Amino acid sequence: MIRIGHGFDVHKFGGEGPVIIGGVAIPYEQGLIAHSDGDVALHALTDALLGAIAAGDIGRHFPDTDDKWKGADSRELLKDVYRRVKEQGYRLGNADVTIMAQAPKMAPHIDAMCAAIAEDLETDISNINVKATTTERLGFTGRKEGIATEAVVLLFKQ
């Protein structure tokens, strides 16, 4: 049996940098406003995994109303959810992440993001794809007000 999950997340720029995305700290004059570390890529990926196992969303498992998760490392949240995936008898087939941002430039950091995600999801890096695009200066991402990310995962029954 296979399961597909989709995730989406958005965070607004604010405060001091760096931007944490895909498990990588990217130098930038602003950070992202969030209850946790604001890693939109890992939040979307975490939601995709939760969706694939029909387990709700990241806010249900790590609510921003709980101080326990304040400043949380999103890599730890991702690993926790992947443990739940494995407990249900699934393993990752592949993950595909799309980052929508006018700034900062993501291209120099994509390989490091793929490596971090592959490590956290206990898979070969060839099963992880991260790509970035701009919105041609349209919308809130185009105005450099924030970053949006989508993620899709394919899970296989072990």
Swiss-Prot record:
Binding site for a divalent metal cation: D9, H11, H43
Record pathway: Isoprenoid biosynthesis; isopentenyl diphosphate biosynthesis via DXP pathway; isopentenyl diphosphate from 1-deoxy-D-xylulose 5-phosphate: step 4/6
Classification via InterPro entries: MECDP_synthase, MECDP_synthase_CS, MECDP_synthase_sf
Site feature Transition state stabilizer, where: H35, T134
Alphabetized UniProt keyword annotations: Isoprene biosynthesis, Lyase, Metal-binding
Lyase is among the record's keywords: yes
Cofactor binding comment, as recorded: Binds 1 divalent metal cation per subunit.
Residues reported in the UniProt entry to bind 4-CDP-2-C-methyl-D-erythritol 2-phosphate: 9-11, 35-36, 57-59, 62-66, 101-107, 133-136, 140, 143
Reactions catalysed according to its record: 4-CDP-2-C-methyl-D-erythritol 2-phosphate = 2-C-methyl-D-erythritol 2,4-cyclic diphosphate + CMP
Homology family: Belongs to the IspF family.
NCBIfam families: ispF (TIGR00151)
Name recorded for this polypeptide: 2-C-methyl-D-erythritol 2,4-cyclodiphosphate synthase
Species: Vibrio campbellii (strain ATCC BAA-1116)
